[in-house]
């Protein structure tokens, strides 16, 4: 399965590939579970546009690595894993709780989301630029220095 939303910019949708038997079984499960939509053309159009964004996924991953490496080298916070294989960066916020970390981060103009009591998740995607990564790193660095 290949997801078209999030990083690729579509509001919803995925592509499922497989053998004829697999796809027939998937269709059956979809019907049994109440899936399916009528008038889905507008969403399909967004999916077609998202497919054109596939070449940019490597940029999302490059930015995630830049963010992770910057946090690790310039702040007291740790990142797990240190070299993210995807566009998600998980930050260990200790000695702060995730809520305190997020509150302080927001005071520098950067928003993120808690991912547990002492972890925060940051995600790069189609709408995150290199300048945004630099801003986030600057904010996290200031936050770290203030501790």
Where in the sequence are the language-model features?
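Active-site C-terminal subdomain of aminotransferase-like
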Residues: 1-94
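Conserved C-terminal alpha-helix-loop-beta "cap" of PLP-dependent enzymes
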Residues: 72, 76-144
């Amino acid at each position: 399965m290949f997801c078209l939303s999030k990083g690729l910019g579509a509001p919803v949708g995925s592509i499922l590939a497989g053998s004829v038997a697999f796809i027939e079984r998937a269709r059956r499960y979809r019907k049994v579970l109440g899936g399916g939509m009528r008038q889905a053309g507008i969403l399909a159009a967004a999916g077609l546009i998202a497919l054109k964004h596939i070449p940019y996924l490597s940029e999302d991953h490059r930015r995630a690595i830049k963010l992770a490496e910057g946090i690790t080298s310039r702040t007291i916070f740790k990142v797990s894993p240190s070299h993210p294989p995807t566009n998600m960066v998980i930050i260990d916020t200790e000695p702060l709780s995730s809520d305190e970390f997020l509150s302080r981060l927001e005071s520098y103009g950067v928003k993120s989301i808690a991912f547990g009591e002492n972890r925060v998740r940051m995600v790069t995607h189609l709408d995150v630029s290199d300048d945004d990564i630099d801003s986030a790193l600057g904010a996290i660095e200031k936050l770290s220095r203030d501790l």
